[in-house]
A protein has these predicted regions:
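Amphipathic alpha-helical segments used for helix-helix packing
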Residues: 104-125, 139, 176
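Hydrophobic alpha-helical segments that form the core
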Residues: 100-103, 154-173, 185-195
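Base-recognition residues in the alpha-helical recognition helix of bacterial helix-turn-helix
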Residues: 31, 55-59, 67, 71
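Basic, helix-initiating cap at the start of DNA-binding domains
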Residues: 1-33, 37-49, 62-66
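Hydrophobic alpha-helical connector segments
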Residues: 67, 81-110, 160-163
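Hydrophobic/aromatic residues within well-ordered alpha-helical segments
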Residues: 18, 61, 68, 72, ...
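Amphipathic alpha-helical packing segments from all-alpha helical-bundle domains
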Residues: 74-77, 122-150, 157-161, 185, ...
Length: 203
């Protein structure tokens, strides 16, 4: 390998290492203090980096929050999908996955970063890349359920968007509530009822 190539590879590896460090530090700081109170000077100093590294990797503080939100929201989706996969059928899996995502709104880190600061700073959560990935998974499940005759022959994307939106908005409601613990079971029950409305009528 040429020296120039080795140097380029080393720079790329260093950038990736710095990115991982900054996301981990920001995740901890945002969870403990909230986005607005988080100091970028302190955050970068804690991991032995400069603000220049932050700007180079994320553009600004908002870009760093977007990366943290994407990481946590993706982890939430993966966890929900794992729970859904353990259910006895595609239908039960769809319900379990939605309920699991809603229940994660009780997690303090999820509440503060993804469901409170995220929408306030980054805008509509339904437009986040992580939510779009989750939507595609839900759409695939809906398509299978329609093909199996379990769900009504509706437009799969429309049904998936409404299901995903219901789970997301239930989580947002829980996070903003003064009593998340009491709101959560109500949200899950309503989600199940809404999803059941998509079931095909049995003759």
């Amino acid at each position: 390998m040429k020296l120039r190539d080795r140097m380029a590879r080393k720079r790329s590896e260093t950038m990736q290492e710095n990115r991982v460090k900054l996301i981990a530090a920001a995740r901890k700081t945002f969870a403990e203090r909230g986005y607005s109170a988080a100091s970028m000077d302190e955050l970068t100093a804690d991991v032995g980096l400069t603000r220049g590294a932050l700007y180079h990797n994320f553009g600004d503080k908002r870009g760093l929050l977007a990366a943290v939100v994407d990481q946590i929201d993706t982890e939430m989706a993966v966890r929900a999908q794992e729970i859904g996969a353990r259910a006895g059928s595609d239908w039960q899996g769809l319900l379990a996955e939605g309920a699991a995502y809603i229940e994660m709104a009780l997690n303090p880190e999820v509440q503060r970063i993804v469901l409170l600061d995220g929408p306030a700073v980054l805008g509509d959560p339904s437009q986040w890349p992580s939510q779009n990935n989750c939507l595609q998974v839900t759409k695939s499940t809906v398509e299978r359920l329609i093909a199996q005759g379990i769900l009504k022959p509706l437009d799969a994307e429309a049904a998936a968007r409404l299901l995903s939106g219901a789970a997301l908005n239930a989580a947002l409601w829980i996070a903003a509530s003064e009593d998340p613990q009491s709101v959560m079971p109500k949200a899950v029950e309503a989600f199940h009822a809404l999803a059941a409305g998509l079931l095909a009528e049995r003759s």
